[in-house]
Amino acid sequence: MKKLIAPKNEFGIDLVKIFAMFSVLSLHFFLYSGFYELESHGLQAIIHGMMRMLFYQCVPLFIMITGYLKRNAKFCAAHYIKLIPVLISSLAVGLVTICYKIFCLNQSFAPIVWLQSLWTFNQPGYGWYINLYISLFMIIPFINGAYNSLKTKKQKTAAVIIFIFVSMFAVSINRIPLHGEYIQSIGFIPNYLSGLWPLGYYIVGMYIAEFRPKISKWRCALLLFIMLLFEAVANYVTTSGNFYGGITFNNEDCVNVPIALLIFLMFYDIQIKNIPIRIAAAKISAVSVVFYLLSWIGDDYFYTKHRAEFKGFSNLTAMFFKIIPIHIILCLTASLILFALLKPLNKAITAPLFKLCSRSAAAENPAPVNPTPVSETESCSDASDVGYDAESKTDSDTQKDTVEV
């Protein structure tokens, strides 16, 4: 009898990541369908505004997952080696994207232009997220050190609130339109640090991982509906017909924090014993980076092909369900294939580096006669949790369940 070994991943976190993955494609539907150019009138505008805000949480959710899983990462070589698979994924998808542009879109640029787009991680159409992630990943050990130096829950709660206030609250307030003759917006709260909004979501993820707040699923769903309705209505009543004429909530708005938080809390603590389902969820969530980046090709293909079929709000929902399901299936299939092709390369590059780190750490810190057990999260030389996905496992879950099939 063959035995299946359950993945170390937290199933609930895999669900959050899968939701974020599929939200990427769903959000881009609104970008390419002409939604932002439509006149915001009627119930359809509010309904689709709620859908947009639901899917807009994809990037905040990814960052919160990073905070949740990397909360104990420390400054050491092993931490930075874990970034290599992400870089390889971006470069690989960049090459695929270049081939698509050359052979399918008939684009022609000098080789140096193509190369520059690769080494700046801009070639995959959505490579901006890789630029964000690299920067965040580089400073994670120092963020963790600062956060973990706070001794009490009260201090850490205050840190979360103040960070959100400094990096996001100002944007939300200053953006409120007044449409006055001399004053167009309120604009009285300093927003110089608004670019730090990713750190706000990262710290929220750390906080959830440490204190594991609980809220019933039906309350999460109800509060989520209320917040989505609030954002959609707020935009609707402040707009002058055009979407961008109103309050257009984005990632850096603090109003988005409770929405992302509610989605996270709805899924993150779900547990199941069905090992095949857990394995499937782990495999899907592991390809999130490739899935995100590859989706640009599908977006370009589908929305170019179906552009003439969009007829405003009258068929927006129908077009959503016509494009998004098949887009998800094809993008996921391509991601799993590319993932499998890149996995040996990632292991070939990272495995020797991890061994070198382990030897260096062992030489610098000889084991005591009666060693104290050290958790996986406290050991910079332990690369046992590193596969293709640098965030595929929790730091504390090392249990392996088996079932006969």
Label each PLM-derived region with a short phrase.
Residues 1-371, 375-380, 388-391, 400-405:
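Alpha-helical transmembrane segments and their immediate juxtamembrane cytosolic regions
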Residues 397:
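Active-site anion-handling motifs in enzyme catalytic cores
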